[in-house]
Every structure is written in C-alpha cells, then in structure tokens.
Amino acid sequence: PNQTNEPDPNYVNYYERALYNHILASQEPDKGGFVYFTPMRPGHYRVYSQPETSMWCCVGSGLENHTKYGEFIYAYRKDTLYVNLFIPSQLTWKEQGIILTQETRFPDDGKVTLRIDEAPKKKRTLMIRIPEWANQSKGYSVSINGKRKMFVMAKGNQYLPLSRKWEKGDVITFHLPM
C-alpha cells in the first residue's frame, strides 16, 4: 500500500469516478483500441484507435492511465490500513504482517469481500471507504465472519473504522447499494 496522510474521501470519490467513467472507458473492451479524446457532448460517439490505420500519438500517453489501477486501492497511515477502492486484488503489507484478499465484481455487483490471509497478533484498524452515494438507508451493510454489524452512518463519503485483533481466516463482507 501507499503511505498517506489520512485520505480525504472527497478525493477518493473523484478518483473512483475518473477511473470508471474516463480511464476504463477510454479502452474499447473487445479489440483493445483507445480513444483519442472523450467527447463531452451527450450522445456523442467515440473513435477508437486501430493498430493498422489509426494509432495517434496521444494513445501512447493514454496507456499510462491503465498502470494506475492498483496504486490507490489501499493506503496506510502508521498501522491503519485504508481500503479506498473496490477492485479484486491481494495486498501484502510486509511491515505489518498483513496479507489481505479483496474479491468483488464492483461496479456490476455491490458485494465486496475482504479475507484476512495473514495477520499480526495485535489489534489493527481497517478503514473501509463508504462512497458518497452509499448509506445505510439504501441498504449498505457490513458483516464480520457472517455476523452483521450495526453502525451509525447516516451518510456516505466517509471511512468506516473496523478495529480488532484480526486473525487468519477472518472475512469482512459489505454490500454497497447499486
């Protein structure tokens, strides 16, 4: 994970919107071509690069965006781990002795599972980002090892602290309303 000051959920929400609505959308899913630019007009079409006929200079610099996927999924501050993005991944945080696996189909499905594969013998805090569009009234829920936890969170756009002595095999499951 990247060391950070306490992440501001406003910036993480912006990052997530840019990732899904611009960076991922810049690549054609079937053939892999890239857009030269993303038009702002409603209903406008995109033109994707073709390897033999249209490979623009900006396509090369746009490729850099796709290397950013894993950079901000997790961040840490001291011994606190922040889960910023919901992307299938595995984190090995050697300094804290934590190995964590995240499973999700987000944004197609709002279920996110974090599995503790290795944990230190001391209390640690996981800070789970609650997106600005999610809150309990819309069906947001969290369970640890199958037991639903109740939290007072009237709105999204904040981090949910989960502090405990984590053990190998612990599973955190949360559902984001989609």
Predicted segments with their positions:
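Aromatic (Trp/Tyr) and acidic
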Residues: 1-129, 135-137
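Glycine/proline-rich low-complexity spacer/linker segments in large multi-domain proteins
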Residues: 81, 147, 176-178
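Surface-exposed coil/turn segments at beta-strand junctions on protein surfaces, enriched
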Residues: 107, 119-121, 153-155, 165-167
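A generic structural signal for beta-strand entry/edge sites
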Residues: 109-113, 157-159, 169-171
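C-terminal beta-strand-rich structural cap/linker in extracellular carbohydrate-active enzymes
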Residues: 124-127, 162-177
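Solvent-exposed beta-strand/loop surfaces of large extracellular or lumenal domains
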Residues: 136-164
